[in-house]
Amino acid sequence: MRILITGGGTGGHLSVAKSLKEAFKKKDATLYYIGSIQGQDRSWFENDEDFQKKLFFDVEGVVNKKGINKIRALTDIVRASFAAKKLIKNESIDAVVSVGGYSAAAASFAALQLNLPLFIHEQNAVKGKLNRLLSPFAKRVFCSFVPPYDPYPVQNIFYETRRIRKELTTIIFLGGSQGAKQINDLAMSWAKELQKHNIKIIHQTGTRDFERVRSFYAKERIEADVFAFDQNLAQKIVQADFAVSRSGASTLWELATNLLPALYIPYPYAAGDHQKHNALFLYRHDASMVFEGQSPQDILSLNIFSMSENLLPFSRPDGATKIVLSIVKMIEK
């Protein structure tokens, strides 16, 4: 079985690509990858020996471009699509699996032109423009936000350590690897009140804001586990009883799988406002909060147990394995 995985650009897309790669590897698939020289694709997969071959095309997103720049971006995708077709033919690829993002365009279009099965993983509650365009032609679209609610590929640690939270003793603020100033500012404005109630603070600041936030805690003599980024972030997350976070799909499903209640602060400039729609999905099931100016007192008075319990239907293991098994069945029919 020869599988071409394509797409990426950002960590959300790429973490899914990595999870699916590892699940396909367990099925002894021969794997290939096509991405872009833009974004993070190369830093994730350029030296990944699990892939038989990797191609990184000089392509960019089309959505926010106008005039000559849009024409140039489309031309680059068409050119890359011919190169993708060549790889697919030469390597006798059985199926293409797209995780979305502009870097998936070339290989996805190549698959359709060659009448090859195309499978799409849509991470968000609102489809990206490329996925919206390609979905009607795909063999199957996997998504955790719409029926049949496919399990999301997250690290097994989030399921293995899941627990229903009964009281708030530890809170984690997740500013992301780049940092979210809004979340960092909120954490600092809450810190004294949380300290008064003996709530342990874990705070991922992101690299850009680390020094400012670290200095604040030191100056105010507030004990906190403050760090810019940690490769073992999952170990920090599972210690917490409540999270304050952006609502990118991968983070949201990691927290949900761990039964960790959260206050989500959607990134306001996300394409199609998808972070807001991601957060609202859990909010409508009384399984999370969406930021509306809440105070630390609002969090301290929460029924943590009820919110954590309401996450149970959304906590499912082996998302990547189940998606891969489904793909394999459809290929082998």
Swiss-Prot record:
GO MF annotations in UniProt: UDP-N-acetyl-D-glucosamine:N-acetylmuramoyl-L-alanyl-D-glutamyl-meso-2,6-diaminopimelyl-D-alanyl-D-alanine-diphosphoundecaprenol 4-beta-N-acetylglucosaminlytransferase activity; undecaprenyldiphospho-muramoylpentapeptide beta-N-acetylglucosaminyltransferase activity
Annotated Pfam families: Glyco_tran_28_C, Glyco_transf_28
Main location per the UniProt record: membrane
Keywords: Cell cycle, Cell division, Cell inner membrane, Cell membrane, Cell shape, Cell wall biogenesis/degradation, Glycosyltransferase, Membrane, Peptidoglycan synthesis, Transferase
GO cellular component, one term: plasma membrane
Enzyme Commission number, as recorded: 2.4.1.227
InterPro entries: GlcNAc_MurG (IPR006009), Glyco_trans_28_C (IPR007235), GlycoTrans_28_N (IPR004276)
Organism, scientific name: Nitratiruptor sp. (strain SB155-2)
Protein name, UniProt field: UDP-N-acetylglucosamine--N-acetylmuramyl-(pentapeptide) pyrophosphoryl-undecaprenol N-acetylglucosamine transferase
Enzymatic class: transferase
Family: Belongs to the glycosyltransferase 28 family. MurG subfamily.
Listed Gene3D superfamilies: Glycogen Phosphorylase B
Entry coiled-coil feature ranges: none
Membrane topology annotation: Peripheral membrane protein
Taxonomic placement: Bacteria, Pseudomonadati, Campylobacterota, Epsilonproteobacteria, Nautiliales
Protein localization: Cell inner membrane
GO annotation (BP), single: regulation of cell shape
Reaction equation(s) it catalyzes: di-trans,octa-cis-undecaprenyl diphospho-N-acetyl-alpha-D-muramoyl-L-alanyl-D-glutamyl-meso-2,6-diaminopimeloyl-D-alanyl-D-alanine + UDP-N-acetyl-alpha-D-glucosamine = di-trans,octa-cis-undecaprenyl diphospho-[N-acetyl-alpha-D-glucosaminyl-(1->4)]-N-acetyl-alpha-D-muramoyl-L-alanyl-D-glutamyl-meso-2,6-diaminopimeloyl-D-alanyl-D-alanine + UDP + H(+)
PANTHER family for this protein: GLYCOSYLTRANSFERASE, UDP-N-ACETYLGLUCOSAMINE--N-ACETYLMURAMYL-(PENTAPEPTIDE) PYROPHOSPHORYL-UNDECAPRENOL N-ACETYLGLUCOSAMINE TRANSFERASE 1
Entry function: Cell wall formation. Catalyzes the transfer of a GlcNAc subunit on undecaprenyl-pyrophosphoryl-MurNAc-pentapeptide (lipid intermediate I) to form undecaprenyl-pyrophosphoryl-MurNAc-(pentapeptide)GlcNAc (lipid intermediate II).
Pathway(s) the chain acts in: Cell wall biogenesis; peptidoglycan biosynthesis
Gene: murG
Amino acids binding UDP-N-acetyl-alpha-D-glucosamine: T10, G11, G12, N124, S177, Q275
CDD domains from the UniProt entry: GT28_MurG
Domain of life: Bacteria
